[in-house]
A protein has these predicted regions:
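Conserved helix/coil segment N-terminal to the catalytic DExD/H
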Residues: 111-148, 344-348
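Conserved interdomain linker/interface between the two RecA-like ATPase lobes of SF2 helicase motors
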Residues: 172, 186-284, 332
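SF2 helicase catalytic motif II
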Residues: 131-134, 140-179, 183
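Conserved SF1/SF2 helicase motif Ia
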Residues: 67-90, 177-178
């Protein structure tokens, strides 16, 4: 492809956008796959772009957005969907650079902050996660007004059982509501990309081009054998490198790989299967690297010591201490157990080449743009569902694709560590699977019961689908409907409709007089055969059904064994969501979670009325931890042993529990989750929680955040439950009060006496306890402090004059705001008041 075809000046883009790309981002020519995709995008067509990591997919999407907003549909809006919050922040930064130059407002939607709401309402381009967009379409359907283009990044995560169904429903709903909107999907290479493009009516652009050539190799013990090269037109490397043997211990191939790449000025990413492995590997590599730097680059140790000291000062756990120690040797680990501040420090240090190596779990490959010259996938198996399984090819390719930094590295090196058996034979098998083998097809995960009941209720409650025919039509527009037989799809829908009706989340408002059969694919001889004893029909499906979530019964619990045991819903059936169903959909929780919460809360009310067993904050936290929406902490093998501290805790709180569960691994995980939350709101130090339960600060924060959200959901569900008599409503109110108190304590991590103080900006639970020990109980007490007490407070460690003045100013602002609100309330006429 010649240069004129790749020149920005030939795209017809606004002059100021071309100027921005050339002057700010240094882009004058498009990469070949970008140039191949841009004509389709510029013309406004739906486009699916499947090219390797770091090949410039995002720029194509940005061009499409600017073209729609400033050329094709002036005054319209764009939505950029990402699967992860970390990726949202990255895209937000890039789009804000564009927006500042072109006078376009960029908004972010990843949580519930009030500032986000204002951004969402006012922005021209909204960057959001799939879950946030789904929630917005339920609560604020006007978010789609004026939208002319939608970008779905990391589209291959449609294959993910957790995130995939929401992405699939979002795309189906957007196509249903906005059939004329342009859809741009960005994906890694997948096996059935053409079928996916057909589903979305998109032009498919596939390329293997990379900005930096990528050499794939297997590493068996210390023997490195290059297997394939994915070339770039910019590369001077034409052939595979020769096999060679690395220097170093056979027992530590990661060190051999690191010392080898570091000697040539490169960095290393090591992917391992678990958090524990990431920390252990980083610790070993850091110790070796620290000795190496002491001999060869002692100046580097000074810079690393500064970073280590910074991490140590902010550390509140053994894991944080370990991270700070690893960093002394230029190595760090990266996983979901880290706090956000720790991840940010580590990522920036690696980007700035202060760190030479990161050990990480596979989540890094999907979420953060941190390329390195060399990638080593140390672990190709993962422990899953009680057994060790090989990783999918797609996932490994994502990791390997992080090798090679554009503009910095002459080539990327993607290495696969081969373990066990005959090294040569294992290496050949690994190469055949992960280097030369095909990538798996993407399959819809929407048929799984959690996904189907969640999105089916949403479609009825907030999606405007009120009859069986329209429901079927909508779900036929999903990838599940595109790739599966009609009868399989309709049976999944109908079984879940029956469950939602049974649980009173929806009701039938106009039951059809005559059931219509969906079994139009069943031959006539089946009717006669099925009446014979012992004869049933097995339906062949194009993909394997998704297993029920471990630890839960299937919500439908239908026990379907043959054709006669299932009754389909009539096509003319009408449905509407109940008050409970509407609220559950708005709360964005699984209907099964709502059902579990409702059952437990009803038991709690009966206990309060009868004054039998206790209902405590622990009771409520344990109930929440039993729902599928809560990510339970899993007990370690030692914690499952009889006589363990966790077993003892389970026995002590048995009378407080609101749900019945067997004493198994999952049940102990629920107790552990509630106990972790209890330790948090009883003001235990994060180090103490880590010592007691082995839970890192990042996990404490993520679980307590989830707990707070689900306690709010429990409150709303209880308020909409209509089974109790009027004489018992006072007891319901008592339980609502306990839910509110528990949620406030969980969110603040403190005892009840500090709840007023932690409302003050800049006052967390530790500072609130310091104030309490000085006799300060309320924000008003702060305003009454004498100069002597103020000076005493300013002198305390971690406080200081500036902080104290800010806190006092914050309290004053709260007091003024409350006075203004009181006056406004006093001026508001009462209902029925005459206004002459």
């Amino acid at each position: 492809m010649g240069e004129p075809d790749r020149a920005l000046s030939n795209l017809g883009l606004p002059e100021n956008f071309q100027t921005f790309l050339q002057q700010e981002w240094g882009i004058k020519l498009l990469h070949p796959p970008q140039a191949k995709a841009v004509p389709s995008v510029i013309s406004g067509k739906n486009t699916m772009l499947c090219i390797p990591t770091a090949s410039g997919k995002s720029l194509v999407a940005y061009i499409g957005i600017v073209n729609q907003l400033l050329n094709l549909n002036k005054g319209s809006r764009a939505i950029y969907i990402v699967p992860l919050k970390a990726l949202a922040s990255e895209k937000l930064g890039e789009l804000r650079q564009i927006g500042d130059y072109l006078n376009l407002k960029i908004g972010l939607g990843i949580g519930d902050a009030p500032s986000e709401t204002r951004q969402i309402d006012d922005c021209d381009i909204l960057v959001c996660t799939s879950e946030k967009l789904d929630s917005l379409m339920r609560s604020k359907p006007e978010v789609l007004s004026r939208v002319s283009v939608v970008v779905a990044d990391e589209f291959h995560l449609l294959n993910d059982s957790q995130r995939g169904p929401t992405m699939e429903i979002n795309l189906a709903r957007i196509r249903h509501i906005l059939p004329d909107a342009q859809l741009i999907t960005l994906s890694a290479t997948v096996g059935n990309s053409q079928d996916l493009a057909d589903w979305l009516n998109s032009e498919l652009i596939i390329s293997k081009w990379r900005p930096v050539s990528l050499e794939y190799a297997t590493l068996a013990e210390l023997d490195l054998e290059p297997r394939a090269i994915q070339k770039s037109e910019l590369s001077t490397t034409e052939n595979l490198g020769p096999p060679r043997t690395l220097e170093g211990p056979k027992s530590h191939v990661a060190w051999a790989a690191l010392s080898d790449v570091y000697s040539n000025g490169g960095q290393l990413l090591v992917f391992v299967s678990s958090r524990r492995s990431a920390q252990a590997e980083a610790k070993k590599l850091g110790q070796r690297m620290q000795k190496h730097l002491a001999k060869n680059n002692p100046e580097m140790l000074d810079s690393l010591k500064e970073l280590s000291n910074k991490l140590s000062r902010n550390s509140n756990s053994v894991m944080g201490d370990t991270l700070a120690e690893c960093v002394k040797g230029g190595v760090a680990f990266h996983h979901a157990g880290l706090m956000h501040s720790q991840r940010t420090e580590i990522e920036n240090a690696f980007k700035n080449r202060l760190l030479c190596c990161l050990t990480a779990t596979p989540t890094l490959a999907a979420g953060v743009n941190l390329p390195a010259r060399r990638v080593l996938v140390r672990d190709l198996k993962r422990y899953d569902d009680g057994m060790s399984r090989l990783l999918p090819v797609m996932e490994v390719r994502q990791m390997l694709g992080r090798a090679g930094r554009p503009r910095y590295d002459p080539i990327g090196e993607a290495w696969l560590a081969c373990k066990g058996g005959d090294p040569r034979q294992v290496a050949d098998e690994i190469a055949d699977r992960y280097i030369h083998g095909p990538v798996e097809d993407i399959t819809s995960k929407l048929a799984a019961e959690p996904a189907m009941r969640f999105h089916l209720l949403s479609s009825i409650a907030t999606g405007g689908l009120t009859n069986r025919r329209s429901i079927g039509d909508f779900f036929r527009g999903t990838y599940l409907g595109h790739s599966q037989t009609n009868s399989y799809l309709q049976e999944n829908i109908d079984s879940m409709l029956k469950w939602l009706v049974e649980k009173r989340f929806i009701r039938r408002t106009n039951v059809g007089e005559q059931e219509e059969s969906w079994n139009d694919e069943i031959p006539s001889w089946v009717s006669a055969a099925q009446s014979a004893s012992g004869v049933s029909m097995v339906k062949k499906k194009s993909t394997e059904p998704v297993e029920a979530t471990f630890g839960f019964k299937k919500a439908s619990s239908m026990g379907v064994t043959g054709l006669n045991s299932f009754e389909y819903e009539a096509l003319d059936n009408e449905y509407e969501a109940t008050s409970m169903g509407h609220r559950v959909s708005q709360l964005y929780i699984d209907p099964l979670s709502a059902d579990i919460l409702l059952e437990g809360l009803r038991r709690a009310v009966r206990r309060i009325v009868r004054k039998t067993l206790p209902v405590t904050s622990f009771s409520l936290c344990h109930l929440v931890s039993s729902t599928p929406d809560f990510i339970s902490l899993w007990p370690k093998s030692k914690e499952l042993e009889f006589g363990s501290r966790l077993r003892q805790k389970g026995a002590l709180v048995e009378d407080e529990l609101l749900i019945e569960s067997p004493i198994d691994e999952r049940a102990m995980g629920m107790v552990k989750s509630a106990w972790c939350t209890e330790l948090w709101y009883e003001e235990k130090d994060l180090r103490d929680i880590e010592k007691e339960l082995g839970v890192t600060p990042g996990d404490v924060y993520s679980r307590t955040d989830l707990m707070g959200w689900l306690l709010l959901a429990a409150r709303e569900i209880l308020l909409r439950d209509d089974i109790f008599a009027d004489e018992h409503l006072g007891y319901v109110s008592e339980l609502v009060g306990l839910l509110d108190l528990t949620r406030s304590r969980v969110r603040a991590g403190c005892k009840e006496d500090l709840l007023q103080l932690v409302q003050v900006r800049g006052v967390g639970r530790n500072r609130a306890r310091t104030l309490s020990e000085m006799g300060i109980r309320t924000p008003a007490d702060l305003l009454a402090l004498s100069n002597f007490d103020l000076d005493k407070l300013k002198s305390k460690r971690g406080w200081g004059p500036i902080l104290v003045e800010r806190i006092i100013d914050s309290v004053r602002n709260i007091a003024v705001g409350q006075q203004d609100k009181t006056r406004r309330d006093d001026d508001e006429p009462l209902p029925g008041e005459r206004q002459d």
